[in-house]
Amino acid sequence: MELRCDNIQYSIEGSRILNGISLGVSNNEFHTILGPNGCGKTTFLKTVYRITKPDLGAIYLDGKPLDNISIRKSAQNMAVVAQFNNLNFDCSVLDVVMLGRTPHLKMMEQEKKEDYKIAYNALKSVGMYEKRNRSYLSLSGGEKQRVVLARAITQQPTLLLLDEP
């Protein structure tokens, strides 16, 4: 999936937060946006994953204007790890990660096995496999963030947006 942002501008209460941000990301590319606290990094990501609408400019996914793509379709292609998560689930680490597979869960036993395999591999990739049966609420803040990252990985998105993971 290719992402292109052209001249993104956004203001809050008359204060310009984003001023002409342009960016292109092609398949299999990795980009980092750096800047001091409060410079608009999170706000920019929110425009990409449609929490905030820019005042000016356009965002394209695979050459199509984001506004012309259903929220459901764009959500199927994007996974987000937010700066702060508000998950308050009293369940296991594995259960939280399996939430990333929920849209894909199948009724056939063989396909369920594949969903669990994807979840196990995601947990291994973030170093949380050994804690898969622990309560999510018992984890430290950093461990919770790694679990949320694993959940995003299980979605197998074409675009993964990470806000200070």
Stretches with model-predicted labels:
Residues 160-164:
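Catalytic Walker B motif of ABC-type/P-loop ATPase nucleotide-binding domains
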Residues 34-36:
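The feature captures the beta-strand-to-loop junction immediately N-terminal to the Walker
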Residues 49:
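Helix-to-loop junction immediately C-terminal to a conserved catalytic motif
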Residues 98, 113-131:
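Conserved ABC ATPase "signature" region
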Residues 57-65, 74:
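Conserved ABC transporter NBD signature motif
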Residues 135-139, 143:
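Conserved ABC ATPase signature
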Residues 156:
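Conserved catalytic motifs of ABC-family nucleotide-binding domains
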